[in-house]
Amino acid sequence: MGKITFYEDRGFQGRHYECSTDHSNLQPYFSRCNSVRVDSGCWMLYEQPNFTGCQYFLRRGDYPDYQQWMGFSDSVRSCRLIPHAGSHRIRLYEREEYRGQMIEFTEDCPSLQDRFHFNEIYSLNVLEGCWVLYDMTNYRGRQYLLRPGEYRRYHDWGAMNARVGSLRRVMDFY
């Protein structure tokens, strides 16, 4: 079970809303989000309703302003609690439809360029666990939640290009 609290103002001030499940539309509860407190679980925040727009991965902790979660604005319109899995395994491919060179990961990777010798991934398969993919190295830049399943081309995980810099397992330690 997860718990997250959204605050309209920075520093955990102003009107707030507490949440423990996925929400496809948070607009009725607050007009802007400038700080967040994650009491438990791992969460993905979305700038738009229905789990669309820029994504932001948050784990337990305090985020006193939206820049702390690498947000571009104070817009949070939907959220998803990410289920925790015991093991993690993902396969990345250099071409669409699982073609070309493949590499499998079971651990976090801060620099795909260093491990894979290129930084464009056109398809992938999440075999176990949930992952967050970043378009820059060292877990920076645009973020994409990857749940178990097949992603035949980068559009399938919501990216506008094939650039991948790093990836991280979704893990929450209680």
Curated annotation (Swiss-Prot):
GO biological process, any: eye development
Listed Pfam families: Crystall
Region (Connecting peptide): 84-87
GO cellular component: cytoplasm; nucleus
Domain of life: Eukaryota
Tissue: Detected in the superior olivary complex of the auditory hindbrain.
Database matches in PROSITE patterns: CRYSTALLIN_BETA_GAMMA
SMART domains: XTALbg
Ranges for domain Beta/gamma crystallin 'Greek key': 2-40, 41-83, 88-128, 129-171
Single GO MF descriptor: structural constituent of eye lens
Record InterPro entries: Beta/Gamma-Crystallin, Beta/gamma_crystallin, G_crystallin-like
Keywords tagged on the record: Eye lens protein, Repeat
Entries under PANTHER family matching the protein: BETA/GAMMA CRYSTALLIN (PTHR11818), GAMMA-CRYSTALLIN D (PTHR11818:SF119)
Extra information: There are six different gamma crystallins identified in mouse lens.
Primary role: Crystallins are the dominant structural components of the vertebrate eye lens.
Domain remarks: Has a two-domain beta-structure, folded into four very similar Greek key motifs.
Protein family membership: Belongs to the beta/gamma-crystallin family.
Protein name: Gamma-crystallin D
Organism the protein comes from: Mus musculus
